[in-house]
Amino acid sequence: MFFNTKHTTALCFVTCMAFSSSSIADIVISGTRVIYKSDQKSVNVRLENKGNNPLLVQSWLDTGDDNAEPGSITVPFTATPPVSRIDAKRGQTIKLMYTASTSLPKDRESVFWFNVLEVPPKPDAEKVANQSLLQLAFRTRIKLFYRPDGLKGNPSEAPLALKWFWSGSEGKASLRVTNPTPYYVSFSSGDLEASGKRYPIDVKMIAPFSDEVMKVNGLNGKANSAKVHFYAINDFGGAIEGNARL
């Protein structure tokens, strides 16, 4: 199993976020997220090797624990092929299929993570004789949202339906955010405007029909006439701008 490379390979975990790219790695995933609709038999994810060397690639899904080994994870999805070789400047399509081995909620989205681990080829023994060598295996993770058919509303409108409230204690400012929709809402950034200043918010993904508390950095206590500005992420990795008064 390529994931268990502890002695000769240093694993650098690279999380693929919106508006960023895994340019430090040679394998590039087409997109920043996967939307798997329940009426689809499968979804294809394209991988491209932008580097100059062939690479071995391992693909799998997890439930959110990025330290879990692929063999220990139980998810209702398969990734085919799980291991592949991608030559330089070539690509590979990974087929994701929902197996229904675990029943998922039908009234809301479910989230999983799609992983890609690229392992460089073994170096020529003669060229590296008597030399110290560090090989890096880069791992990229993006979210997979399983979306049941018939959910109410539109996922692009979910960020604008969020409810924002003051929270916090002992002089520390934070916000409680309620998501009344059946869709996950992810953010790229957010800040709070008060008294002519802006304070960064530690934004978090909010699950359907749930709350999250987000810290407001640099602000002590509540502020009058405050306004929240945020950028949420749509199905295509683009930005949805939103505002809310407190």
Curated annotation (Swiss-Prot):
Which range is the signal sequence, renumbered to this chain?
A: 1-25
Where, subcellularly, is it found? Answer: Periplasm
**InterPro entries from the entry?**
Ig-like_fold, PapD-like_sf, Periplasmic_pilus_chap, Pili_assmbl_chap_C_dom_sf, Pili_assmbl_chaperone_bac, Pili_assmbl_chaperone_C, Pili_assmbl_chaperone_CS, Pili_assmbl_chaperone_N
Induction of its expression = Repressed by H-NS. Induced by heat shock.
Any single Gene Ontology cellular-component annotation: outer membrane-bounded periplasmic space
Q: Kindly give any further remark recorded in the entry.
A: The operon is cryptic under classical laboratory conditions, but is functional when constitutively expressed.
Q: Which family does it belong to?
A: Belongs to the periplasmic pilus chaperone family.
What is the protein name stated in its UniProt record? Probable fimbrial chaperone YadV
Q: Which organism is it from?
A: Escherichia coli (strain K12)
